[in-house]
Amino acid sequence: TSLWSAGFLPGIHQGTQFRAQGDPVLFLSNPPGVQPSDRQRQLSALRSLNDLRARQTLDPAAAVRSSQYDLALRMQSSVPELLALNEESQHTLTQYGASAGQPSFAANCLLARRMIERGVRTVELFDADWDHHASIHTALPRKCREVDRPIAALIRDLRQRGLLQDTLILWISEFGRTPLQQGGTAATAGRDHHKDAFTMWLAGAGVRPGMSLGATDDFGMDIAERPVHVHDLQATVLHLLGLNHEQLTWRYQGRDFRLTDVHGQLLHEILL
């Protein structure tokens, strides 16, 4: 849950997880026999109790609960419409490689576009099965085919709808893979985790297109030119969001924190 938690921010900024199977958002539907009017009365009573608790304890979590319940109530009507991918044209579904009612990374990319259209500020997509310690020669091409088409469709779709200029896209993982074979024969071998050199890409708002920054050695083992630390990336993303990473602080457990700690330099080369 830390991947979409509010972190240092107030709990109202906590992300909402959408699931690929079953109810897309847990506990969003009313239990059997509970009418919308019943739920309204329940929430009104809860709001009174939470407000009383917040005044008594000055606990930020108590103050946030009412807002979270109100958000859940609004989502009961908005989420079904949001998830109705069958409203999209067949041309759009084909562009993404998605099928209505079938969970996939392609469907998630299309869902991301629908969220952005409706004003959702941050969307995070996850894709699994990239940990190729074995059979990388067959597994990696398969994974690339699964993601390449919908990613391209998402960028193209956002541009055509005039949304890309205000949307920052980051494609990123927590590490790369070693350039050396790991285990097995040539046919079944994989690659191990590699934190010392890996790539990511950005597109959209404020990012210079059609360029690369930095390079590895010929083996892909070490950074050979223009190393970029994660704090540099964080500083640049905050800049694109209109925030100065050196001035943005949050008081937590008695001291002020910066999201970039005491580090971070803007990547001016990639900025428009």
Predicted segment positions?
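Ligand-binding pockets and gating/stacking loops
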Residues: 1-272
